[in-house]
Amino acid sequence: MSPSPDDIRGRRILIAEDEAMIALDLESVLQDLGCEIIGPVADVADLVQQFEAHHPDGALLDINLRGKQVFAVLPRLIQQGVPVIITSGYDDVTLIPQDFRELPRISKPFNQTALRELCVTVFAKR
């Protein structure tokens, strides 16, 4: 049976996005799914701080936050079993280090239906 939105209701999802309008869209989609939002954060230092303080059930991360990439933080999330979805305005997969190319990702601007489906699929796994 495929996961349903009920499977992620109450999950604490960390949002890292430095573009305010996109962050609001991400937050809206996740709230509609019944998730609790951590953030959104707009830089890597805040991402690390919020991750350590709240131990999220999932993370939706822009790969580039105010000119700094999030790739150094990803191993910590993955090691602790936190499901991650990468968001990016870049379609070129070669911009993502090889170790992280298999992570679920969605391109910006995103389709809200596709984002909802991806969030349910990925965040229901934990």
Predicted feature residues:
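Non-catalytic signal-transmission and effector/linker regions of two-component phosphorelay proteins
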Residues: M1-R12, S107, N111-R126
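Conserved acidic carboxylate
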Residues: E17
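Two-component/phosphorelay signaling modules centered on CheY-like receiver
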Residues: A20-G39
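Acidic, metal-coordinating helix/loop segments flanking the phosphotransfer/catalytic sites
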Residues: P40-G58
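Active-site residues of response regulator receiver
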Residues: D62
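The feature encodes the CheY-like receiver
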Residues: R66
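Alpha4 helix (beta4-alpha4-beta5 surface) of REC/receiver domains from two-component response regulators
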Residues: A72, Q79, Y90-K108, T113, ...
